[in-house]
Amino acid sequence: MTRTIFIVFAQLGFSHNTTEQFRHTAFFAAATKCSFLRTLRVMLARTVISASCFAVHRKEKNLARKSTAPQLKIIPLGGLGEIGKNMTVLEYNEDIIVIDCGLAFPDEEMPGIDMVIPDMSYLEQNAERLRAFIITHGHEDHIGAISYALEKFKVPVFGTKFTLALIEHKLHEHHVEDTCLECINAGDVIEIGCFKIEFIKVSHSIAGAVALAVTTPVGIIVHTGDFKVDYTPIDNEPIDINSFARYGTKGVLALLMDSTNAELSGVTPSEKELGKTFEKVFTEAQGRIIVASFASNVYRIQQVVDTAVRHNRVICFQGRSMVMITKIAKDLGYLELPEDSVVELEKLKNYENNRVCVLTTGSQGESMSGLFRMANANHKLIIGKGDTVIISASAIPGNEKSVGRVINQLFQRGANVVYDRLADVHVSGHARREELKLMFRLLKPKYFIPVHGETRHLYRNAQLAEEMGIDPSHIFMMDNGNVLELGKRSAKLNGTVPSGAILIDGLGVGDIGAAVLRERRLLSQDGLFSIIVPVQKSTGELLGIPEIITRGFVYIKDSDELIAEAKEFAFDLASKLAEKQSRKSDWTGFKASMKSGMKSFLLSKTKRTPIILPIVVEIDC
């Protein structure tokens, strides 16, 4: 295969020296593990390719483009005006790269939905120009949709080793094969088509987070990813301020910056600050200690592990994602776990309660998480009197009720619960206003696009940009699907592309729409009321009293009188309607009238409006 690649490179016009350079690069050695076409595509993408290399294939297109003054397009497909679903397109001529590919979690208006991913139809329409996915870090709101994307697009994915390890696990779970994951480190520079991308180390609540400095034909674009400025991080690798300053000196055309904490003044505390709280709780606790945290925050987990070891406690990991991610983090060297301190759940009985520390999922009150099941006595480890539970996270918007219920249940079981309103058990991974100001000062961007947040977050970040001296006409409050066109000396919003939400329900992708969600909401509110009407097939004559089936409306055994009245009303109504039925084979009008009549009856009797489902059963007798 290697020989074949060299031949193809020669035919495309590469010099012997250029081809030989690939022979001696680590990238080439890694790429040969991919399929031939994939390898060729990636190698071409990472090479600075002059127009002459493709003169044979693109001559007419290149001649046409020279007179059109090409613009760089920035197109967010998700992540604006919402939490999650982060995805941003950078497009110039024949090259498209996509930054992040995340999911959002369903809200209370989406019953039965597992997750929400961005609408990728624009990428499908332009698949031949898509070169790569560039991932800033491994949180679900940045990688959660990648398996669905790679089922459609056979392009490389670039990310740090921890990010790619999480993606690889996700792809394995979804049985997505024949992919090409390209590992990079902070400080690396790669070239994909016309884009030159440098990965810059940032601090965040997950290992391996990077910002992106993208050099394009019209100027430098900086995308911060999720970040905060932490000078004392757990891994002793602080944010690379020097690289941001270096790009500020070069001149930044546009900045896309994290808006999550743009409402909050001051600076986000260092992750290391939590060590003081953990030390205090571990010193005072007399029984077992259970810590619930995000599994992906290996820095938080490392602090808990270190504190437990100092206090002579063994450590047990519970919850599927906690077990999986800690194993990955340990294997990659991000997490130090003393072998003799980690035990399985079954062996905890061999230790006194004051020697036990359990790290579990469930900081958001998720119904299938370890902490939730422990609080509901649906787990081998049942929390009780004398236990101390630390919920080391703040509730994500929309999860407040779930978290509150778990806290209440833990108190009812006699546990001592330590959470964010009582102690400093959580710090954010996102920059506050003073850190955002620092980034404005360092980068001095000509144009600014606030990203990653609800509308209120974006608005406050845009306000801050104006305070920092950026021309208000150079600040773009965009919506998902907007197209921002950037030239070397110009910027304007110009149209939209398809965008929105694709709902995932089990194995179904995008087959749930607004009508289905509306019916599900109605079902969840007042239930289902079904009337089964038997009729003679040839004559349309009513053959008996309709049968009634309800779900989530009333408990039939306690509602005999209502059901009897409903059957009588349904029989009278069906009899009248059957007499008027002109076409015995078409019961559409009959069912619509039954539905309307039963709705009025039930509303008058119960003040409820269940989903009413008339069913006509034709009997040939």
Task: Describe every region a protein language model picked out.
Residues S585-D620:
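C-terminal tails and terminal domains of large nucleic-acid-associated
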